[in-house]
From Swiss-Prot:
It comes from the Bacteria. GO terms for cellular component: cytosol. GO terms for molecular function: ATP binding; ATP-dependent DNA damage sensor activity; damaged DNA binding; mismatched DNA binding. NCBIfam families: mutS1, PRK05399.1. PROSITE patterns: DNA_MISMATCH_REPAIR_2. CDD domains: ABC_MutS1 (cd03284). Transmembrane segments: none annotated. GO terms for biological process: mismatch repair. It comes from Bradyrhizobium sp. (strain BTAi1 / ATCC BAA-1182). This protein is involved in the repair of mismatches in DNA. It is possible that it carries out the mismatch recognition step. This protein has a weak ATPase activity. ATP binds at G659, P660, N661, M662, A663, G664, K665, S666. This is DNA mismatch repair protein MutS. Belongs to the DNA mismatch repair MutS family. Keywords: ATP-binding, DNA damage, DNA repair, DNA-binding, Nucleotide-binding.
Amino acid sequence: MTIQQPITAPVPQETAPAEAPAKLTPMMEQYLDIKAAHPGLMLFYRMGDFYELFFEDAEVASKALGIVLTKRGKHQGQDIPMCGVPVERSEDYLHRLIAQGIRVAVCEQMEDPAAARARGNKSVVKRGVVRVVTPGTLTEDNLLDARANNYLLAIARSRGSSGGDRLGLAWIDISTSDFIVTECAFAELTATLARINPNEVIISDALYSDEVFEPVLRELAAVTPLTRDVFDGATAERRLCDYFAVATMDGLAVLSRLETTAAAACVTYVERTQVGQRPPLAPPAREATGSTMAIDPATRANLELTRTLAGERRGSLLDAIDCTVTSAGSRLLAQRLAAPLTEPAQIGRRLDAVNVFVADSAAREDIRAILRGAPDMTRAMARLSVGRGGPRDLAALRDGILAADQALGRLSALDQPPQEIAAAMAALARPARALAEELSRALDEQLPLIKRDGGFVRSGYDSTLDETRNLRDASRLVVASMQARYADQTGVKALKIRHNNVLGYFVEVTAQHGDKLMSAPLNATFIHRQTLAGQVRFTTSELGEIEAKIANAGERALNLELEIFDRLCGQALAIGDDLRAAAHGFAMLDVATALAKLAVDDNYIRPEVDGSLGFAIEGGRHPVVEQALKREGQPFIANSCDLSPTPGHKSGQLWLLTGPNMAGKSTFLRQNALIALLAQIGSFVPATRARIGIVDRLFSRVGAADDLARGRSTFMVEMVETAAILNQAGERALVILDEIGRGTATFDGLSIAWAAIEHLHESNRCRTLFATHYHELTALAAKLPRLFNATVRVKEWHGDVVFLHEVLPGSADRSYGIQVAKLAGLPPAVISRAKSVLAKLEAADRGQNARALVDDLPLFAVPSRAAPEPAMSKEAEELIAAVKALHPDEMTPREAMDALYALKAKLPKG
């Protein structure tokens, strides 16, 4: 967790120092005033082409960015630390600071330095903070992950009468205008936050100081405590109404008091960080409780839904299924994966859309080709709405509207499109085509990234602009002809007319010709301005007049372009809701066609999803592992699983899975959880048939990891996660558990696993997959009617184990741990000793005195040299000799079969 700590500038002390300190410059006084008005923020203070940082800000930035720390002047007798970053590269530095949880106030020059000089020598350029950059309020492309939402989330609390807190949550993405609210109990908060995955969380300072919330806050990326007035429920509705410019919220959304408070906190924080600007947001959409599958953070991490355990996207489930071709589509797919649906009808509508594009490959590929040309309109709109957009953002809107026309034309050929596709088509039809036509006429072919320097309006669009540009360009041609005339007049062929920001236009000659221009009669025309080491510079009254004309024409042309930009921007923002709807339509089509491509390429089938407690998967495969094996040219062994209620029982089954390590137990557990999850996001699934009754909660206890920061051992983490499952899982949950109890003594672990199985069977009564190495547990099938024993098939060959990865009814009689250890490369001496110990343990009576067993098998009886090979029997020697005498390459199939039977006959009987 990153907590926003205040970054402060020193305050002048009232007591005078021993020696008079250097007086602060007017500029530094201005800096300290602005800094004091923005506590807790790093201040980027604009000075010309740089953002300067001073005092503690400079020290923090120097370390965070790896830039040189220097000094500028003194304060209270001490050097003032200083560093700076160039304005043109500032967004790169902002990205690095934001990634470290540092919030930044950007302070710009609000006037031209010439205006300050005109007021007097001691006047300072007017400056002001124009925005506050925080992790949850970003809009720039290079500060955002194009494939992920960037959520700001607010939490409001209400004390329950029975002691149970209720929480209101509101989360927004100002880069896409998304705005969602919900309520939850404190016990549900961790799972809800894991699903939303906010980039920044704002809470009241009272909530921040509450010890009960400390474990929750620790798991969050960035937490910003705010004063209580931001979470004032009495003013919340008024603040929301002000933001949306309505008299009442009733026409936009019906929210609870807690939801209203959290939503108001969000918009208040946005207004503060955007310095009074109000990015357009969708009306708050209320998320119904229980409408999505609940998945706790541990399960999300263990199943590697969006990130692997190493924190990488590559190798996750999202990476495996993401075939989208647009950023908006990728974001929507990630949203769906984070929140699988629990309503069969909604799931069915999504599956219908995917099915259309599975069946019609031509339509699928045509739509995907169109989508590749559809830009990210929502984020372009967000930048334009807060004054950070450029000409390319306007072009994105133009191209998006044109792509919408293309998509509609192709989709119109579909016969009775399903509801999801029909909704996307309706959204694509909303934006007025007149805007695209206007933008096409106005924008040039080659567009600059920013509007500041102009050059983006097409010639012929505005006659006044064309005339002004002609005047500007003609004046520059006059300068070129003037240079030729001055060269003839002076006889100095090397004479040049140049320009810089200090002198403006000037005549430049080499030093050897300088005296000539400063002597009569040329000195009447050429006025000396500057002498350098090798050049002398002059001006003329004629050149001054031309410069004024060029400057005026250039400035006027730029102002005209900026006026045109603002007008076009206003036209776009006026239909912002329609443009955002079209962008969402693109995203819906992208997800549907992407999942269809995945289904066709990887042979997925449409699942049957209903309200039963069924769970029958035939030929199921792990979507991520299968792709990894495919890249290596290896097949994936499919397996079936049926946790559906058996005849005479209402609740689902509990499968007890035994088998050796590396046989595929964990893969089998995970693949069934992932298939259920894919089905409920509306995707086809990797199986030959799948019937899944809605899963309302998904739990997993797989893998092993400690939590040293919270003082938890690996076993403690395992027990905490198991406790959550046993306390929370209901009949409609799906639970996967892998080797419960392995982190402690054998009999302790066996006892815990035994009791957990009984509790899951009798109390939770949920559909469960339970993998274990405790073979004694398989005996529970005799007394627990819904427990089914399954095992992963293996085969031994000459002392080695061959993993067949097939799940079959039955139970394993051994774990093959020593064979797996041998495969891992343990020294032969250790393997030999392990076999010897295992033989004695298996022969020993488990009830015998422990001391006697330890005496028989001392823990540290490690041989000082390699263990001797066991003596070989005469029969074994004869078998080896017979095998060595065979030459398979020279034998016919019949001869090989006869030889095999002959060898078998030599084996000892019994």
